[in-house]
Curated annotation (Swiss-Prot):
InterPro entries: Ceramidase_alk, NCDase_C_sf, NEUT/ALK_ceramidase_C, NEUT/ALK_ceramidase_N
UniProt cross-references to Gene3D superfamilies, sorted A to Z: Neutral/alkaline non-lysosomal ceramidase, C-terminal domain (2.60.40.2300)
Annotated consequence of substituting H123A: No ceramidase activity
Cysteine pairs bridged by disulfides in the record: C346-C394
Binding site for Mg(2+): H61, D603, D605, T608
Cofactor note as given: Binds 1 zinc ion per subunit.
High-level lineage: Bacteria, Pseudomonadati, Pseudomonadota, Gammaproteobacteria, Pseudomonadales
Binding site for substrate: N84, Q92, D111, S130, Y469
Consequence the record notes for mutating R184A: No ceramidase activity; when associated
Reaction(s) catalysed (UniProt annotation): an N-acylsphing-4-enine + H2O = sphing-4-enine + a fatty acid
Identification of the protein by name: Neutral ceramidase
Binding site for Zn(2+): H121, H228, E435, Y472
């Protein structure tokens, strides 16, 4: 038998073995997968990511979701929980509240040690869910409805995952994806002396953890790959989970189609990696932000699907974890992690290069113009005197724009941050609370791998944007260049070295089965939040119209590939977020228009868009579009709108709605 034939036979045997049902009692783990809606306010709330005062929500393209994975070791009953969210960041406020809720509902089961929360870093979701002022500047303060929707949804996703615990097996695989990201700060990257293998500026590694049930069926997967979720530009006003959210949607909705299947596309060291392959907003590979979102998402899906379908390495062994809060203010760093000299971190400050934004993904302006920002004015302004000389020296090459760590009565950026590590058999997963550049993450990954090999660790996955958010982390060499990422590295030139020290120490603790010390406590600032974004006083319909009336009816007929556009008199979307529901339905009533109505699309589907606009002082218009996708059954359809309106006199919020006349889908264009 030839070598190629033998290899093919061996691969076939492996795949057959993986797909064969196994006795539940023989399986090493139980796992549960769950998903819940975390979509915030869909109108008149600043979006989180681009820091633009002008970018406010005005509808929904697709909803935001939390995807939870609960893993339980069969032998010990020990559990780990990983949640990936379609959010710009996991802010510490969210982490603290979620953990408080879990501890209250499941005492002794879930705590900071075994729950990791992560974000995809979409820039097209409503903001205002941080307790630190720096991240609420362009949103005009704290947005309680959005915050509660996020917390409630994350908790609900974990509850659903726990309710679905089943025996199963885990498999790890990896591969390279080289056409879905590009380094937006290549000159800074090239200053690193250790870029062998990374000369083109990207980290191509994708890691996939597959969840296989007792029948040998794939129940879900987590894919880690570094690329910013900025395919949608700062000109977009529709809520969107961006490219990673589309990858999840495509696998779950278009490919698997199995109830309960959950696919998460998580981040790693994406700090300087853009999906805009032409290095300008909304460009690359196409010149349309929606096409780019789908294409970059499809490329991530295709690689993850390929890896999950290959013969993978089975994950076997114990579950373990470590977690600690660390005060980053003046944290000492040992010489082996620096330039051979003892160093320390600085009080947090942002640099002038941050104000320009990232021109490749979307420039600022951060909402820093005090005359245009009542929230900033109420905080006392951006600059409060000349920064102390000690801070200027500590921050080295950075020209300080604002010393955010010295703001009173509370700092504008975190001082205490979470560091976390999971052990899942021979895999270690690191949870880091910031955006790490390619080499900042690679250095930590390599160092942890070296520290963990003696414990049988074969794979290290680095997950940024986890448990909290403290802007960027660059290498020492990149920091000196003071591009956007360097100006956004809060704690000074040795920030990456500090994280590397903390993760190596934690890896050693896991290896030696030692506890880690938490000497700091993350402050709860929920008492002290402000909001200058106006709410809903009341809703009025158009003169001579009623809520739910159709302002624009569909044509009599369309063909597949056409776009149907209709409009309704509606209320303000802030009245009801319609969590786990929808603002629209596309309904199929059959070829004769008389069959039982069947919903074929909602506001979570790629082919629909729900756009809201204010008309006059208190009226609202909802414009709904449906791009008829290939595979749509010919027949009669109508579009229904759901909304809510607030009465001025009683302040009561009531559900409203309306439906268009029916229209016919004829098939493809001749």
């Amino acid at each position: 038998m030839s070598r190629s034939a033998f290899t093919a036979l061996l691969l076939s045997c492996v795949l057959l073995a993986l797909s064969m049902p196994a006795r539940a009692d023989d399986l090493p783990y139980r796992f549960g997968l769950g998903k819940a809606d975390i979509t915030g306010e869909a109108a008149e709330v600043g979006m989180m990511g681009y820091s633009s005062l002008e970018q406010k929500t005005a509808g929904i393209h697709m909803r935001q979701w939390a995807r939870a994975f609960v893993i339980e070791e069969a032998a010990s009953g020990r559990r780990l929980v990983y949640v990936n969210t379609d959010l710009g960041m996991i802010f510490q406020a969210v982490h603290l509240k979620v953990l408080a809720r879990l501890k209250a509902k499941y005492p002794g089961v879930y705590d900071e040690n075994n729950v990791m929360l992560a974000a995809t870093h979409t820039h097209s979701g409503p903001g205002g869910f941080s307790h630190y002022a720096m991240y609420n500047l362009s949103v005009l303060g704290f947005q309680e409805k959005t915050f509660n929707a996020i917390v409630d949804g994350i908790v609900r996703s974990i509850e659903r995952a726990q309710a679905r615990l089943q025996p199963g097996r885990l498999f790890y695989g990896s591969g390279e994806l080289r056409n879905a990201n590009r380094n937006r700060s290549l000159l800074s990257h090239l200053k690193n002396p250790d870029i062998v293998g990374y000369e083109d500026g990207i980290d191509p590694q994708m890691s996939v953890l597959s969840f296989v049930d007792a029948n040998g069926e794939l129940a879900g997967a987590i894919s880690w790959f570094p690329v910013h979720s900025t395919s949608m530009t700062n000109a977009n006003h529709l809520i969107s989970p961006d490219n990673k959210g589309y990858a999840s949607y495509h696998w779950e909705h278009d490919v698997s189609r199995k109830s309960g299947f959950v696919a998460a596309f998580a981040q790693t060291n994406a700090g300087n990696l853009s999906p805009n392959l032409n290095l300008k907003p909304g460009s690359g590979p196409f010149d349309n932000e929606f096409d780019n979102t789908r294409e970059i998402g499809l490329r991530q899906f295709a690689k993850a699907y390929e890896i999950a379908g290959q013969a993978q390495e089975e994950v076997l062994g114990e579950l373990d974890s470590r977690f600690r809060f660390v005060d980053f203010t003046r944290l000492p760093i040992r010489p082996e992690f620096t330039d051979g000299q003892p160093r320390q971190l600085c009080t947090a400050a942002i640099g002038t290069s941050l104000a320009a934004g990232s021109t490749e993904d979307g420039p600022g302006p951060l909402g820093l113009e005090e005359g245009n920002n009542p929230f900033l004015s109420a905080l006392g302004g951006l600059l409060t005197g000349v920064p102390p000389q000690e801070l200027v020296q500590c921050q080295a090459e950075k020209t300080i724009l604002a010393d955010t760590g010295n703001k009173k009565p509370y700092p504008w950026t975190p001082t205490v941050l979470p560091i976390q590590m999971f052990r899942i058999g021979q895999l270690e997963l690191l949870g880091a609370p910031a955006e790490f550049t390619v080499m900042a993450g690679v250095r930590i990954r390599r160092a942890v791998q070296a520290a963990s090999e003696a414990a049988g660790i074969r794979h290290v996955v680095f997950n940024g944007y986890a448990n909290a958010y403290a802007s960027y982390v660059t290498t020492r060499e990149e920091y000196a260049a003071q591009e956007y990422e360097g100006g956004s590295t809060l704690y000074g030139p040795w920030t990456q070295a500090a994280y590397q020290q903390l993760f190596v120490d934690m890896a050693v603790a896991l290896r030696e089965r030692l506890p880690v010390e938490t000497s700091a406590i993350a402050p709860d600032l929920s008492c002290c939040q402000m909001n200058f974004q106006t709410g809903v006083v009341a809703d009025d319909p158009y003169i001579g119209k009623s809520f739910g009336d159709v302002l624009q009816q569909p044509r009599e007929s369309y063909r597949i590939g056409d776009k149907v556009t209709v409009a309704f008199v509606t209320g303000h979307p802030k009245n009801d977020l319609r969590t786990e529901k929808t603002f629209l339905e596309v309904v199929n009533i059959g070829k004769d228009g008389k069959q039982t109505p069947e919903t074929v699309a909602t506001d979570n589907d790629w082919d629909t868009q729900y756009r809201w606009e204010r008309v006059g002082i208190s009226a609202s218009k909802a414009t709904i579009s449906w791009s008829i996708p290939p595979g749509t059954e010919p027949g009669h359809y109508y579009i229904r709108h759901y909304g809510n309106a607030k009465n001025f006199w009683t302040q009561k919020i009531s559900e409203i709605g309306g439906s268009t006349r029916s229209f016919e889908v004829l098939g493809t264009t001749p």
